[in-house]
Structures are given as C-alpha cells and as structure tokens.
Amino acid sequence: MRIGILAIQGSVVEHEKMLKRLEVETVLVKKPEHLDIINGIILPGGESTTFFTLLENRLLFDVLREKLANGLPAMGTCAGLILLANRIENHPDQKTLKVLDITVSRNAYGRQRESFSTYIKIPILGEKEFECVFIRAPQIVEIGKNVKVHATFENKPIFVEEGNILGLTFHPELTDDLRIHEYFLKRCSE
C-alpha cells in the first residue's frame, strides 16, 4: 500500500513519521501525476487559504477533486478538513474540493495561543481515550445526512466520515497514538 501526503505545506513530516511507524510507503504529493500511484491521501493541517492557492498553482485542485469523487480515500486534518468541506460558514467565497457534506467555521477554537489538547472517547478506536490536539481548529457546524460522526467535543463533531472521506478538526499526527492512522489505512485497503 502506498499513501500520499499532500506536501505543499503544513504538518507533512509529522504524518509521514506516523505512516513510517506503521511501515507504510509514503508519496509526497506535489504534482498531479503523484495522485496516480497512491491508494489514499492525507491532507494535513496548515493554513487553508494558502492550501487553495498552492493547489491551483500546481494544477492539483481539479485532478484531486476528480480522484476523490471517484473514490480515492482521503483523511483531512484541521486545514485539510476545511479543504474537503462543502461549505465554509465564515468564508463562503473560499473555494473547496466539496467532497465532504459538512459546513465548517474556520479558526472556531480561537487563535494560536488558545490552542489546547484534551482526551476524547472515540468508540471506533476502542476503549482508550484519544488525545485530540486543537490548533486554531475549525469547527464542524453542520453535517449532511450521510455523514457519520465518530467523535464530538462540546456537542460539536470533531471526527466525521462520509464514504471514502475522513475529516478531523484536530491533529492526530501530533500525538504518539497511531490508531486514527491505522483506521485510515484500514479504510484504504477496503
């Protein structure tokens, strides 16, 4: 199995380290042709407006959207989630891939200095709580009828799934816990 990491900005190295610990081959996706040789893709955290600009400059936006619409599994964390979302509440004109039927609000959990981590029960990962690291995190404010919610914080979804797409408002790559990456790999092999 070969997993791509969208490598134009953000927490690329951290996701790569997690996948290496799981002994998975990684591809740093920087060009459209890289999308042809992977079994799934991670869209890391970073700055969402910059993401869109760089995706379009590298001619990745339309090709990535088509691959995702045709079933390529994806996991988006923080800004990666924003990129996948259908709608952005506080930036309605910002372009997105529109492959996950949710509405998000950018930076809903505050600025950098207000970042935090907390332990959350995520039933699909087992009994042990998962450390969720929120850094200028988006908030999912609305979900479509086919979106599964795997975890919530303060009654808001923080980990969702729709078809081949996983979306997280937090950063699992900033912990030592491999369970979310393992879950994503399982989804990629189905």
Swiss-Prot record:
Domain of life where this protein originates: Bacteria
Entry keywords, A to Z: Glutamine amidotransferase, Hydrolase, Lyase, Pyridoxal phosphate
Pathway named in the protein's UniProt entry: Cofactor biosynthesis; pyridoxal 5'-phosphate biosynthesis
GO cellular component, one term: glutaminase complex
Residues reported to bind L-glutamine: G46, E47, S48, R106, I135, R136
A molecular-function term among this protein's GO annotations: pyridoxal 5'-phosphate synthase (glutamine hydrolysing) activity
InterPro entries linked: Class_I_gatase-like (IPR029062), PdxT/SNO (IPR002161), PdxT/SNO_CS (IPR021196)
Annotated active site: C78 (nucleophile), H171 (charge relay system), E173 (charge relay system)
Keyword Hydrolase: yes
Catalytic activity: aldehydo-D-ribose 5-phosphate + D-glyceraldehyde 3-phosphate + L-glutamine = pyridoxal 5'-phosphate + L-glutamate + phosphate + 3 H2O + H(+); L-glutamine + H2O = L-glutamate + NH4(+)
Keyword Heme: no
Assembly and interaction partners: In the presence of PdxS, forms a dodecamer of heterodimers. Only shows activity in the heterodimer.
Role summary: Catalyzes the hydrolysis of glutamine to glutamate and ammonia as part of the biosynthesis of pyridoxal 5'-phosphate. The resulting ammonia molecule is channeled to the active site of PdxS.
Family membership noted in the UniProt record: Belongs to the glutaminase PdxT/SNO family.
Stated name of the protein: Pyridoxal 5'-phosphate synthase subunit PdxT
Phylogenetic placement of the source organism: Bacteria, Pseudomonadati, Dictyoglomota, Dictyoglomia, Dictyoglomales
Gene behind this protein: pdxT
